[in-house]
């Protein structure tokens, strides 16, 4: 499985459209504590975008306006034309650890004409958004999910993400080690064995991993195992099954680490989340 698919499958993000049509009045957007992101796609017309900092920019051609963590922003539509636009929220799984939410810049404004695949997806998206067909909302959300994948590809290929897991996945050597951790969490990984996966020397791998990911390999491995443990416990697996799946010798060892990291025992976590 390719690295981006692995992240999307594991962490997940889902688009939910809340407006399609001509925006003709001033509108403010905000999310409490960055719980959701905002994705806007301008089809035609024009608007002024006012960001949280107070900066103002004119947007008058097909454009993607993306606030991954729901930063406060305002749209002031052109009084003559308004703005034909699709607006959606983004719901993240495991928000506190979701690398998609954490890694992206707080604001992205991307012109459609600069990215050849954008118009191809958006033509189908706009056909649904500005129609009255049955199943319209569900279809829009599916196209938005596809469009989000293309946005993430653009960010990775153009190095708009510089730190964190997503940046690591854009590095072909580090990506090998990250995919190994994600797909084989039960293995007894060490810096040496991960460096071998990355085809790098031990010292160079450790330094590069820390610089790009922002964590040591051991710290990242621990975080990943705890993310998996939470997911498996929520799905009803026994503590013994979870400990085996993520590489602990026994359930007691896993329970000690789990409580140290999360402040609650695996059994209590499972009871609280069933």
Q: Where are the predicted features?
A:
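Terminal helix-turn-helix DNA-binding modules in bacterial transcription factors
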Residues: 179, 183, 188-193, 200, ...
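Regular secondary-structure segments
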Residues: 43, 119-130, 178, 182-185, ...
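Short, Lys/Arg-enriched, Trp-marked, Pro/Gly-tolerant hinge/linker segments that flank
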Residues: 108-116, 129-144, 148-187, 191-198, ...
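A short, N-terminal "cap"/entry segment at the start of jelly-roll beta-barrel domains
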Residues: 1-17, 28-30, 106-110, 131
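DNA-recognition helix of helix-turn-helix
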Residues: 259
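Aromatic/histidine-rich interaction motifs
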Residues: 100-123
């Amino acid at each position: 499985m390719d690295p981006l698919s692995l992240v999307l499958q594991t962490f997940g993000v889902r688009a939910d459209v809340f407006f399609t049509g001509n925006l003709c009045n001033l509108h403010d957007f905000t999310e409490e504590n960055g719980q959701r992101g905002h994705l806007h796609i301008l089809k035609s017309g024009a608007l002024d975008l006012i960001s949280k900092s107070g900066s103002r920019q004119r947007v008058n051609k097909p454009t993607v306006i993306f606030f991954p963590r729901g930063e406060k922003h305002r749209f002031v539509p052109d009084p003559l034309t308004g703005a034909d636009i699709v607006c959606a929220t983004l719901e993240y799984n495991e928000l506190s650890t979701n690398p998609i939410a954490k890694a992206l810049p707080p604001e992205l404004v991307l012109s459609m004409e600069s990215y050849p695949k954008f118009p191809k997806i958006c033509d189908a998206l706009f056909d649904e958004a500005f129609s009255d067909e049955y199943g319209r909302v569900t279809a829009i959300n599916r196209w938005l999910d596809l469009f989000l994948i293309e946005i993430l590809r653009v960010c990775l290929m153009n190095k708009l993400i510089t730190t964190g897991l997503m940046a690591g996945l854009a590095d072909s050597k580090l990506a090998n080690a990250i995919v190994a951790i994600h797909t084989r969490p039960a293995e007894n990984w060490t810096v040496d064995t991960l460096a071998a996966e990355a085809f790098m020397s031990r010292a160079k791998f450790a330094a590069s991993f820390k610089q790009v990911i922002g964590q040591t390999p051991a710290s990242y491995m621990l975080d990943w195992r705890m993310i998996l443990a939470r997911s498996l416990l929520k799905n009803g697996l026994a503590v013994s099954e979870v400990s085996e799946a993520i590489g602990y010798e026994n359930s007691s060892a896993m329970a000690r680490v789990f409580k140290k990291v999360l402040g609650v025992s695996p059994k209590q976590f499972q009871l609280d989340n069933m």
